[in-house]
Structures are given as structure tokens and as C-alpha cells.
Amino acid sequence: MLKINVKKQLGQLALEANLQIPARGVTALFGLSGSGKTSLINLVSGLVHPDEGYISLNERVLVDQSKAVCIPAYQRHIGYVFQDARLFPHYTVKGNLCYGIKKIDLAKFDDIVSLLGIGHLLKRYPITLSGGEKQRVAIGRALLTQPEILLMDEPLSALDLPRKRELMSYLETLSKKIDIPILYVTHSIEELLRLAEYVVLLDEGKVRAFDRLESIWENPLFLPWKLEDEQSAVLSLPILHNNTGYQVTALGLQQQQIWIKAQQAEVGENIRICIKGSDVSLSLTQPEKTSIRNILHGKVKRIVERENRVDVQIEIDEKPIWATISKWALEDLALQLGQPVFAQIKAVSVL
């Protein structure tokens, strides 16, 4: 676990953070440009020193200003992947991967090369690589130092969309395979939804919220990053079973299930989905003889009337789902808080 309790004055920005980052998985630092995201991971890495406070990693103190303790960056056992790959142009890919490592664990080397899909690049030089390939090599180099945590500072920001999505797939696999935490800086909603398990929401140097992604998505502080004309819910649910005949997969709620297109994943593995309010309609009675496969019962939790629509939050097995309806429909159904309803979900997006 990474424990952070620091203060740092950076020009006009007063950075303050008190966090306990989980021991594995991806924790995203999210916020506007200039909110302190990169500065915070630079404090963790040792590239910047705090004015006050301490940082510890797996109970090992990295810095404690009250005791004048400050471990140098190169002794912190931290891997850092920057926005640009920062490869040595005169070394091959293999040379870059092995740079600065006294003794290479060949089995680990092969595993990382295979995981990142860079085996065919080992004899090539950085000038011949695409942006995505360079970043995969940079990630491999960081992992081969056997770090206790991996810091990633917007590693996809310099890539075009196809390369970005290609590398994101590798990062998804990487986050599930390696047994260390990843602290990931981004201001991209797509990256957040695809990669993050936990989110630190930063604004003007302050931690405004820290929670699982699904909870942050519902947090009012996150509203500036969501589409104004649409509500949505993000859920992470386990696979119950796969129906090979119909090519669909069932995800489990407490007492109900949600059907999605077939997934190449094991039973019990969590799948993250997004349900848009515009894809959900409501009924006071259970619909019959309908083509809609996902019909779930729940209770009205919130009613938010807007200028040209009404957003109704339904609690289904303790999970929030939004339905966007008209004011006419609200009056016709006479919806009240706590009222039982059936939610008809027309579409589910897998993230």
C-alpha cells in the first residue's frame, strides 16, 4: 500500500494530499490541467520533495520531513513511464529494456516481452518504432527494474487514436497480470473508464474525492466531466455464466442479472458496463411479450427535473441506474420516491 500525506507549494498551487492507495490495480489521478496530478506522482517518485509530510510504500518510509528522511529516487523501487517514451536512440529495444539492470531475470524478461507484445521489436532501434511501440518498450523497461509500484504520467497523450486504443488494450491486460499498484495520471474519460479501479479527483491541488470509479461516476463533483444532456451509470459486475447458443453473457446483481454480448472471460471475472439513461424506459407493471431482454425491478431513488427532460435514478439490487424520461411520462406514471418500477434496458455498453 502507498500512503501519502504531504503538502507542497508549487508557485500559486498549494498541493495537499492524504491518501492510501490500494496495493494492486489501477488508481487514476484525474482532474483538469494544472490540478496537481503530475506533481503528486513526482512527489512519490522522489523527483520533487514535499515541504511537509511523509510518503511510505509497503510500510517502507520514502520520505518523512519531520525526521529529515528522504530516500533518493533511484533507491525507491519505483517504475516511472513518462508522456514520451524517453528511449535511448543509440540502443536497440533490447538494449533499452536491459539498460541499468545488473542481472536480468531471463524468465521475467520473456514474460514481460510476451505480455507487451514486443518480442519482434528487440533488434530494432527507437527511430523505427511507432509511438505506441515506444511506449510499450518504456513500460517494459520500467517493469524489468522490478518496482513495487508503477507510475504512469499520461502515457497515451501523445498517441493518435488507433495507437492509443491499441496500447490501452495492453494496459488493461497488464493491470490484471502484474501484482503491483499502478498510479495513472490522465484527464481522459475513455482511459478512466477502461483502466481505473479507483479514482483520485484533484482540483487546484486538493483531493476532492477518492473512491472506486463506480462511486466517483455518481459523485456530484464529477458532473463537469459528464455530458450535460445525458445521465448514465457505470457498473462493475461479475460474470454468472455464458450462453453459447445465443452468444450472450449474464452479469450478476444480487438477485437479478443483466445480459450483454458474449465475453471472452471466465465466470466470476468482473466486467465493467455503462448504461445510458436514454436507453432505459420505465413501467409500473412488468412488461410481457417484448424483445427487450433486460427488464429489472427496482425502486425510485431520485427524481431530477431538468429543462427538457426528467432523470430518474432507480436502485436495482443496491446499484444505481438512470432512466431519462419526458415530463409528460413523469406526470402520467405519477412517480414517487420509493415507488417500485420496472426498468427496461434497451442497450448496454461494455467498457
UniProtKB/Swiss-Prot annotation:
Chain positions recorded as ATP binding sites: 31-38
Keyword Membrane belongs to the record: yes
Annotated Gene Ontology cellular component terms: plasma membrane
EC number: 7.3.2.5
Enzyme class, UniProt record, top EC level: translocase
Membrane topology: Peripheral membrane protein
GO terms assigned for molecular function: ABC-type molybdate transporter activity; ATP binding; ATP hydrolysis activity
ABC transporter domain: residues covered: 1-229
Keyword Metal-binding in record: no
UniProt-listed SMART domains: AAA
Pfam families assigned: ABC_tran (PF00005), TOBE (PF03459)
Domain Mop span(s) in chain numbering: 289-351
Keywords attached to this entry: ATP-binding, Cell inner membrane, Cell membrane, Membrane, Molybdenum, Nucleotide-binding, Translocase, Transport
InterPro entries (UniProt xref): AAA+_ATPase, ABC_transporter-like_ATP-bd, ABC_transporter-like_CS, Mo/tungstate-bd_C_term_dom, ModC_ABC_ATP-bd, Molybdenum_import_ModC, Mop_domain, P-loop_NTPase
Compartment list: Cell inner membrane
Catalytic activity: molybdate(out) + ATP + H2O = molybdate(in) + ADP + phosphate + H(+)
Family: Belongs to the ABC transporter superfamily. Molybdate importer (TC 3.A.1.8) family.
Function: Part of the ABC transporter complex ModABC involved in molybdenum import. Responsible for energy coupling to the transport system.
Database matches in PANTHER family: ABC TRANSPORTER I FAMILY MEMBER 10 (PTHR43514:SF4)
Record text on subunit structure and interactions: The complex is composed of two ATP-binding proteins (ModC), two transmembrane proteins (ModB) and a solute-binding protein (ModA).
Protein name: Molybdenum import ATP-binding protein ModC
UniProt organism field: Pasteurella multocida (strain Pm70)
Organismal lineage: Bacteria, Pseudomonadati, Pseudomonadota, Gammaproteobacteria, Pasteurellales
Gene name, Swiss-Prot/TrEMBL: modC
